[in-house]
Regions:
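Short, solvent-exposed loop/beta-turn-alpha elements that line the ligand-binding surface or hinge
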Residues: 74-81, 181, 233-237, 306-315
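Short, glycine-/small- and polar/acidic-enriched structural segments
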Residues: 35, 43-192, 208-211
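Bacterial signal peptide processing site
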Residues: 28-31
Length: 365
């Protein structure tokens, strides 16, 4: 549950740039850019003064909040004369639209929007440069729902058409024997709304459930729901990518030192989260309050935090599986994957592993 406040943090976050919420399906091409390996061209960091960063009010994006609140972005990018300008999105498709429109340089996004950006641009628009989080998504339903059959004829929700939770929900429903189309019509209706609107609609009884990321799953539980499916239970070892970090390919080619400085800050944030989880939660809440005027209820936040594993491992195999799920439910064509050259070229972990090597850490494969 979220609480409202008029208090504003003056430490690191300023006014947000507004980005139009265009339909992802309308984006049939990217701004292009070279796809040469990172570090193969010289950077001109002096040519830019701002790194435009996109992320969500989701717990799986906590490394961004921690890096802002603890000053890691300011310190590491500041040595290059670059500052971070954050932009908040509800879900991945909107963030991908901003990447395509050259309105954002780097973004924390889920696997399915990453796949859509990669395939729609035929492998030209983006690169995955790091992981950020695993886990932290659940299907929470009303107390009178005890099985999938109880959902027939009812309406459930996900944050946005084609986003990671939307694919997971439709795939799971179809695997359980329901018939749900890509547009959400079928024996169970799947609608889309912002995470905060989902919590409100669930509380008023307009929704019977929702597949959402943390902390919204815990908010639904606090509103009287219970977990029908914890997505951790659907993946081997409970590991599956919920958030990766992607960069525009052109930005990576032109400014590899800026990207490396960004990744250094993100690695520092991950280390801080591991060592200081309580303060990291406070950083997330403070950052969220500064950006949105809302914060997560203190009774909810620790429970939500426990559902997430923060990691720089992009967990590639689970992204590939998520893409197969999207194909299965009609939200992606296999020919689009093939047309982009598969998923191996999507990943460029060169700079991440340089950062890890400096910290005496083994490379991420």
């Amino acid at each position: 549950m979220f609480s409202r406040s008029r208090r504003r943090r003056t430490t690191v976050l300023a006014a947000l740039a507004a980005v139009s919420a265009l339909a992802l399906a309308a984006c049939s091409s990217s701004s292009g850019g070279s796809t040469s390996p990172s570090g193969s061209s010289s950077s001109s960091a002096s040519e830019i003064t701002t790194l435009r960063l996109g992320f969500f009010p989701n717990l799986t994006h906590a490394p961004a909040y921690v890096a802002l609140q603890e000053g890691y972005f300011k310190d590491d990018l500041g040595t290059l004369g670059v500052k971070v300008a954050p932009t908040l999105f509800n879900a991945g498709p909107d963030a991908v639209t901003a990447l395509f429109a050259n309105a954002v340089d780097i973004a924390y996004v889920g696997p399915n929007p990453t796949v859509n950006a990669w395939t729609q641009s035929k492998g030209a628009a983006i690169k995955v440069i790091s992981g950020a989080a695993s886990g932290g998504a659940s299907f929470v339903v009303a107390k009178d729902i005890t099985s999938v059959k109880d959902l027939e004829g009812k309406t459930v929700a996900s944050p946005q058409l084609g986003n990671t939770q939307d694919v997971a929900l439709k795939y799971w429903l179809n695997k359980q024997g329901e018939q749900v189309a890509a547009d959400g019509t079928g024996s169970v209706t799947v609608t889309n709304a912002s995470n905060s609107d989902i919590v409100t609609a669930f509380g008023t009884g307009d929704l019977s459930g929702a597949w959402v990321p943390e902390p919204y799953a815990q908010s639904l539980i606090a509103a009287g729901g219970h977990v029908l499916v914890n997505e951790n239970d659907l993946w081997p070892g409970g590991k599956f990518v919920t958030t990766n970090i992607v960069v525009r390919s052109q930005f990576l080619d032109e400014h590899p030192d800026v990207v490396q400085a960004f990744l250094t800050a993100n690695e520092q944030a991950l280390a801080f989260i591991k060592k200081n989880p309580t303060q990291a939660q406070a950083d997330f809440n403070s950052g969220l309050l500064a950006l949105t005027g809302s914060s997560v209820d203190s009774a909810i936040l620790p429970k939500a935090w426990d559902q997430v594993t923060f990691t720089d491992d992009p967990l590639k195999a689970t992204l590939v599986a998520s893409a197969a799920h999207a194909v299965s439910v009609g939200l992606l064509e296999q020919s689009a994957i093939d047309g982009a050259g598969g998923f191996d070229p999507l990943y460029d972990l060169t700079l991440l592993n340089k950062v890890r090597a400096k910290a005496s850490l083994p490379p991420v494969q």
